[in-house]
C-alpha cells in the first residue's frame, strides 16, 4: 500500500487546493514540478530549487537508465542520494521518450525495442522493466508504462493504443506490487482527443486502482481547445479524492487553464529550456532578451520580482550581453527567474483558490498580459 496521502482542502469552481504528504515531505497543490531529466534541473543547485518554492521534482527513467545506469544510482541508495535532493521525486516511466523515437523503435504486446540514443545499442523496455528501474531509483511517485498516443491519430489508432496502454497498466500494477514497492503508483489516461476513449481508459484504470491519475498525450501538438475539451470531459469523471497530473504542459496560460479545469500537478521543461534560449516569463508576457530593444534597457527582467536575478539588480541589457557572449551566467540567472515565476504563479493560484477568488485571479492574469480572459464552459465571452 502506498504511503502517499492526498488531502483536498478547498475548491473554487473546478479549481482544487490540496496537499500531498509523503514520508519525504509535503507538496502543496496545485504544484509545478521542475524537470531534472538526468537527475539535475539544468543550471541550478538543489537548494536553489527549494528556495524558489519547489517541493517536488521530476526525474527521467529512460535517460537515467541509459546513463549513468542503475548500478551507479544504486550505489548512492537511489536518485535522492545521487542528486542530493531530499524532497519527493516523481519519475516518468520512459513511455514518452520511447514515443519520441518514432523511427527507431518497435512496439509489441510485450513492450518496446529501440535503438539507444546514446550508443545505438538495442534496448528493450516494458512494464516490468520500467517498474524495476523506478524501484531502484526509489522515487516517491512511480508512473505506469504506457504508449503515448500521437496527434493526430485516427480513432482506430487511438483506440488500439489506449487498449495496449490499459494492458500495460495492469502489468505495471502487478509488477510494482510484486516488487513490494510502497511508492505511489499513478495511472495514465490515454485516448487522444476522443472523449469516449478517454472515458474507457479512465474506467479501466480505476478498475485496476491507482494512487493518482495522470492525463497523458496532451502535449503532443494538439490545439489548445482540444486539450481543454479533454480536461473538461475528464474533470467530473476523475475521482475527487485522488491527485490529478497533466503531463508535459506547459506555458503559464496552460497552467492557469489546467487549474481552472481541476488539475493538481504539472511538469514541463519550458521554464528551464526557454531560459537557455533567452526567453524569460513575466506577469506581462515573455521577455525575449535577444531582441535589440533590450540592448540598453536598465530594467530588471520584471521589476519587483523576488528572484535572484531581479532582486540583485541584473539589468536586461546585462543579461542580453551575457546571452550574446554565450556566458553560462545568462541561462543560470534566466532559469532562476523563470522557475521563480512559475512557482509564484502556483502559489498565487493556491491562495486564490483558498480564498475563493480564483475567478478574479484568472481575470487579472490575462488582463496583465493585455489579453481577454477565455470563457470557461458555461460562461459567455
Swiss-Prot record:
Organism domain of life:
Bacteria
- Active site, renumbered: 92, 267
GO molecular function per UniProt: metal ion binding; tRNA-guanosine(34) queuine transglycosylase activity
Reported EC number(s) for this entry are: 2.4.2.29
Keywords, alphabetical: Glycosyltransferase, Metal-binding, Queuosine biosynthesis, Transferase, tRNA processing, Zinc
Cellular component, GO, one term: cytosol
Cofactor comment text: Binds 1 zinc ion per subunit.
- Per UniProt, substrate binds at 92-96, 146, 190, 217
List the residue ranges of the region (RNA binding). Answer: 248-254, 272-276
Question: Which EC class heads this enzyme's classification?
Answer: transferase
The residues listed in the UniProt record as binding Zn(2+), with positions renumbered to this chain, are 305, 307, 310, 337
The GO biological-process annotations, alphabetized, read as: queuosine biosynthetic process; tRNA wobble guanine modification; tRNA-guanine transglycosylation
Q: Which InterPro entries match?
A: ArchSynthase1/Queuine_TRR, TGT, TGT-like_sf, tRNA_ribo_trans-like
Name the chemical reaction catalysed here.
7-aminomethyl-7-carbaguanine + guanosine(34) in tRNA = 7-aminomethyl-7-carbaguanosine(34) in tRNA + guanine
Q: Pathway, according to UniProt? A: tRNA modification; tRNA-queuosine biosynthesis
Q: Does the keyword Glycosyltransferase apply?
A: yes
* Cofactor section: Zn(2+)
Q: What function is annotated for this protein?
A: Catalyzes the base-exchange of a guanine (G) residue with the queuine precursor 7-aminomethyl-7-deazaguanine (PreQ1) at position 34 (anticodon wobble position) in tRNAs with GU(N) anticodons (tRNA-Asp, -Asn, -His and -Tyr). Catalysis occurs through a double-displacement mechanism. The nucleophile active site attacks the C1' of nucleotide 34 to detach the guanine base from the RNA, forming a covalent enzyme-RNA intermediate. The proton acceptor active site deprotonates the incoming PreQ1, allowing a nucleophilic attack on the C1' of the ribose to form the product.
Q: How does it assemble?
A: Homodimer. Within each dimer, one monomer is responsible for RNA recognition and catalysis, while the other monomer binds to the replacement base PreQ1.
HAMAP family referenced in this protein's UniProt entry, alphabetically: Q_tRNA_Tgt
Family under the similarity heading:
Belongs to the queuine tRNA-ribosyltransferase family.
The protein, known as: Queuine tRNA-ribosyltransferase
